[in-house]
Structures are given as C-alpha cells and as structure tokens.
C-alpha cells in the first residue's frame, strides 16, 4: 500500500500516511497458495509501487518456512547527469525525492502516478519531460510519448488525454500540451526530423479544432 488509512462505516480516509497505530493498510493484495513441493518464489505479473507491505500467513498441518521478502527495482534507465547540492539539508532531501518520483513514473511510458492510474496523461507527461530534459540529455522516452499521442488521433482532430489506454478519454484542453511538448522538444534538441515527419500535422489539426489554425 502507499498509505495507512482510517477505515470505518464503509469509508476509507487518508490521514497521516505512516500512522500505523491508528490506521490500516488498504491497497493491492495478492493471495498465494504454496504447492508444498519445495522452495517457491512468487512475483506479480505487473510492477507494484509501494511504501508499505503487510504479510498475512496462514498455515495448515505442514510447516512453512518463509524467507525474508525482497523486491526488484524496475523502470526506464534514466541516467541523471545533473546534481543539486546545497548547504541547506532540506534542499538535498527535496532533490532526492523529486528525482526518485520522476524515475518511479518512467517505464515503457511516462505515468501520472506509479501506484494508481499508471497512465500517460499529456499534461503530467509534459511536466515530466521537462524535468527529464533538466536532469539528463536522454530524449528517447519523450520522443516515444509524442509518437504515442500521435497514434491517439481521432477523426475530429483531437488527441486522447491519455494514451496508450484501454478506455478512451478526451480532455480538450490537454491537447494543447502536445503542442507545448513539440515546442519544448525543438528548444531542447534543435531537431526537426520527428517534428516535420510525425508531429507537425497533428499540431496543425489541433490548432484548427481550437479555431487557431
């Protein structure tokens, strides 16, 4: 789970997120039944982001030996080449949290949240791309994000607000962030190949829909 919650009367409310004394963990859960045929390892099929883990073990007549749980870190291999250091310790802490938050939101796509939706929303993604530009010269995931959004084009000229996604969703204002992304990319790299080949036409269609083209 990502937080301890106050539960009762069918409601779940977040208070102090690490208050284990008064709260309860509410979140994703798995049920695993050992076969009893020797040492076994369990891993979920999709990555899980967490702050807290709770294990509940029920045994039968046979003994069960439980080894200490471990985790594997996964994500986009962002190599940070920028570093922020300050004599004020809180600045260093904020920098560490900010960089780890960015990395947790980078896998095959950018994600608005690594625990809940895990979806690539245009407005969130633009902010994450700008942060990526500041800490690394790697533009590959940014380029992929713009290719992804290009593939979400609908007949009326709008892009989906999040993509790839199983269910379509359109937030008209979010389309402008795609145009901002393209401008940011040009200012960062000076490259025009992807813009002219893949993204410029989408930008013109969006502007036309907004009555600006």
Q: How should these model regions be labeled?
A:
Residues 1-112, 124, 140-145, 158-164, ...:
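Extracellular/oxidizing-compartment recognition motifs
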Residues 3-25, 137-213:
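Helix-terminus loop motifs that line ligand-binding clefts
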Residues 43, 118, 185:
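Short, flexible active-site loop motifs that bind/organize anionic cofactors or intermediates
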Residues 48, 116-126, 137, 169-177:
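Aromatic- and histidine-enriched alpha-helix N-cap/loop-to-helix transition segments
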Residues 95-99, 111-114, 126, 172, ...:
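Noncatalytic linker/hinge segments flanking ATPase motor cores
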Residues 129-130:
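Helix-boundary and N-terminal cytosolic regulatory elements
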């Amino acid at each position: 789970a990502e937080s301890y919650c106050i539960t009762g009367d069918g409601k779940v409310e977040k208070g102090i997120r690490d208050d284990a004394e008064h709260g309860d963990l509410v979140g994703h859960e798995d049920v695993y039944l050992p076969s009893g045929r020797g040492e076994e390892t369990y891993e979920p099929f999709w990555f899980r982001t967490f702050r807290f883990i709770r294990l509940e073990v029920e045994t039968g007549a046979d003994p069960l030996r439980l080894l200490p749980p471990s985790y594997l870190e996964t994500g986009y291999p962002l190599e940070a080449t920028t570093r922020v250091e300050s004599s004020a310790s809180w600045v260093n802490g904020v920098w560490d949290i900010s960089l780890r938050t960015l990395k947790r939101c980078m896998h095959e796509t950018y994600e608005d949240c690594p625990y809940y939706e895990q979806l690539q929303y245009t407005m969130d993604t633009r902010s994450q791309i700008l942060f990526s530009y500041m800490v690394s010269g790697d533009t590959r995931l940014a380029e992929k994000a713009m290719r992804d959004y290009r593939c979400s084009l609908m007949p009326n000229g709008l892009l989906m607000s999040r993509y790839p996604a199983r269910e379509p969703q359109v937030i008209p204002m979010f389309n402008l962030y795609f145009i901002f992304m393209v401008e940011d990319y040009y200012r960062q790299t000076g490259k025009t190949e992807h813009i002219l080949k893949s993204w410029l036409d989408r930008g013109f269609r969006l502007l036309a829909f907004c009555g600006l083209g």
